């Protein structure tokens, strides 16, 4: 059985979130939360919040045991890009892309044995 949580349109670039997400893939949830607490990245609290939501969904909706949960899948997709303009020299302007992310965390119970 799997439980899932998604955070959509998070205002952090996907490239930056993927650095954090790659640290917790395949880990037990307790270990994953400990890793996120000690990772000095802006994306860490956001990913931790999504992970805790997935754990709560597993416990409440599917009555899984929290002690046996493993981060099965975690991935980051690109959300809508906010386009802004920055003034440049000689009356020109250049485009600034403010990227957003969709963060998905899937947890499942570890197989016995």
From Swiss-Prot:
One GO term of the biological process aspect: translation
- Out of the domains of life, which is the source? Bacteria
Q: Which Pfam families match?
A: Ribosomal_L22 (PF00237)
What Gene3D superfamilies does this protein's entry cite?
A: Ribosomal protein L22/L17 (3.90.470.10)
A GO term, aspect molecular function: rRNA binding
Which PANTHER family does its entry note?
CHLOROPLAST 50S RIBOSOMAL PROTEIN L22-RELATED, LARGE RIBOSOMAL SUBUNIT PROTEIN UL22M
Q: What does this protein do?
A: This protein binds specifically to 23S rRNA; its binding is stimulated by other ribosomal proteins, e.g. L4, L17, and L20. It is important during the early stages of 50S assembly. It makes multiple contacts with different domains of the 23S rRNA in the assembled 50S subunit and ribosome.
Report the protein name in the record.
Large ribosomal subunit protein uL22
């Amino acid at each position: 059985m799997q439980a899932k949580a998604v955070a959509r349109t998070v205002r952090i670039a996907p490239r930056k979130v993927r650095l954090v997400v790659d640290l917790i893939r395949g880990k037990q949830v307790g270990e994953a939360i400990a890793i996120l607490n000690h990772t000095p990245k802006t994306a860490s609290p956001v990913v931790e919040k999504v992970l805790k939501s997935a754990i709560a969904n597993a416990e409440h909706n599917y009555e899984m045991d929290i002690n046996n949960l493993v981060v099965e899948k975690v991935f980051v997709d690109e959300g809508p890009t906010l386009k802004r303009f920055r003034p440049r020299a000689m009356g020109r302007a250049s485009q600034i892309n403010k990227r957003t992310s969709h963060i998905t965390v899937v947890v499942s119970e570890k197989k016995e044995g």
